[in-house]
């Protein structure tokens, strides 16, 4: 039997907690035996004194086990259960293509996603733009769609990782969100509750990333790869670029459109393609669905080119309550804003740098993201045709097209976009889409 205050005291004094102490405290979070003040105190103690790798693994697995842990064995799946998670960015629409692509190659992808946070867009918000799509289905329907279609992208259900839900809300209000140990446990407890065989982790770097520096992003990526592998899930973390909008757009309905255009081959943004392929190929390799990277990429290109990935996306949408002909007729179903107009730079030259975070906040201001939890979203608004760094910009080349519901909203977004995209006489140096892979062998 332990006392919560003694566990807090031990961590406050910089000592390592045992797995049993961590399990006791997490159980108290779940049952309310531990108070908000005690949770906040432990969070702050961890923030200042950190956790070693054994503590991080113990915290992650204890939070994973605080609620339902999904079991796929009874379904008799004939392939690996694989997934990816992103720390979030702007125009990060990867999940919508990657899930169906991995499923088309023989994987099963039970993807539990989140809503928008701060300047970053949420995968669930994009699906809410599709009429009828159930982002919170019953667990029976979720399992059925995963088994029959190969992929289902839904929101976190109440019985998954309840300890994280309570801990996170307290961290958010007590300035302990930025702890690498606590971020690692929060992300992975949710993913590992899905009983994955393999996970590809997308850790963003740059002006639109959650972590402020490359070094902080790398530290988080290493922590996630080490803890996930230590907890028994084959995991690779990729460090990917978020110094500019990843897709050609940012918003909800506009990103769904770009995802379908990508899957059908109508248009594939080269940067989006590079990161999607990198993550998806890693999932196939970790899941044993490909012999090497070249084989993985060939398989993925095949399911894009033969239409199988697009077909699976359509089946997932209809399986979860959306229109049966959504892929073929998405323009009939996706909402459109009142004003769709380009914005031009005041000077000529090259798109030199981008404050990606500010572009994400411009979408929030338009109504496409939340200023506070519970805000209703306007799924039609956002940015499209966002220029890429290095693009030549002149008087006839828009730096973006704004989708707004009023002239006031357009004017506000126009000012934000102009401020966020810097034009220079000199083209910037090209940066890679993927900076590094952190695999189990690298730890």
From Swiss-Prot:
Mention one GO biological process in which this protein takes part, according to its record.
pyrimidine nucleobase metabolic process
The pathway it acts in is: Pyrimidine metabolism; dTMP biosynthesis via salvage pathway; dTMP from thymine: step 1/2
- One matching Pfam family is Glycos_trans_3N
One of the record's GO molecular function terms: 1,4-alpha-oligoglucan phosphorylase activity
Task: Tell me which UniProt keywords the record has, alphabetically.
Answer: Glycosyltransferase, Transferase
User: EC number(s) for this protein?
Assistant: 2.4.2.4
> Record's family?
Belongs to the thymidine/pyrimidine-nucleoside phosphorylase family.
Q: What is this protein called?
A: Thymidine phosphorylase
List the source organism. Shewanella sp. (strain MR-4)
């Amino acid at each position: 039997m332990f006392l919560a205050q003694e566990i807090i005291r031990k961590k406050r004094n910089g000592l390592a907690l045992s797995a049993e102490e961590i399990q006791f405290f997490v159980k108290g979070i779940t049952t309310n035996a531990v108070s908000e003040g005690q949770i906040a105190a432990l969070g702050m103690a961890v923030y200042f004194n950190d956790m070693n790798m054994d503590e991080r693994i113990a915290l992650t697995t204890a939070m994973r086990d605080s609620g339902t842990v999904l079991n796929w064995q009874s379904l008799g799946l004939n392939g690996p259960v694989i997934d990816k998670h992103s720390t979030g960015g702007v125009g990060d629409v990867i999940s919508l293509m990657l899930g169906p692509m991995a499923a088309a190659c023989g994987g099963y992808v039970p993807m539990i996603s989140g809503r928008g946070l701060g300047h970053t867009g949420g995968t669930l918000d994009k699906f809410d733009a599709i009429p009828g799509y159930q982002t919170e289905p019953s667990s029976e329907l979720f399992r059925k769609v995963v088994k029959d279609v190969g992929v289902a992208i839904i929101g976190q259900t109440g019985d998954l990782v309840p300890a994280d839900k309570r801990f996170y809300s307290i961290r958010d209000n007590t300035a302990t969100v930025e702890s690498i140990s606590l971020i690692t446990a929060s992300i992975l407890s949710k993913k590992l509750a899905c009983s994955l065989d393999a996970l590809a982790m997308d850790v963003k770097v740059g002006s639109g990333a959650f972590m402020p520096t490359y070094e902080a992003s790398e530290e988080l990526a290493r922590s996630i790869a080490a803890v996930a592998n230590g907890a028994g899930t084959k995991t690779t973390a990729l460090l990917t670029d978020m110094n500019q909008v990843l897709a050609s757009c940012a918003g909800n309905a506009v990103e769904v459109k770009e995802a379908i255009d990508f899957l059908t081959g109508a248009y594939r943004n080269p940067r989006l393609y590079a990161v999607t392929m990198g993550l998806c190929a890693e999932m196939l390799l970790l899941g044993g669905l490909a012999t090497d990277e070249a084989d993985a990429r060939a398989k993925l290109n095949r399911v894009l080119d033969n239409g199988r990935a697009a077909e699976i996306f359509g089946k997932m949408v209809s399986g979860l309550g959306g229109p049966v002909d959504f892929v073929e007729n998405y323009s009939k179903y996706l909402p459109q804003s009142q004003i769709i107009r380009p914005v031009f730079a005041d000077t000529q030259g090259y798109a030199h740098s981008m404050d990606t975070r500010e572009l994400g906040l411009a979408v929030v201001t338009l109504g496409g993201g939340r200023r506070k939890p519970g805000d209703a979203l306007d799924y039609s608004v956002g940015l499209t045709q966002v220029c890429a760094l290095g693009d030549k910009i002149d008087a006839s080349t828009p730096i973006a097209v704004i989708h707004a519901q009023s002239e006031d909203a357009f004017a506000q977004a126009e000012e934000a976009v102009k401020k966020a995209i810097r034009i220079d006489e000199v083209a910037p140096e090209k940066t890679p889409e993927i900076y590094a892979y952190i695999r189990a062998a690298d730890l």
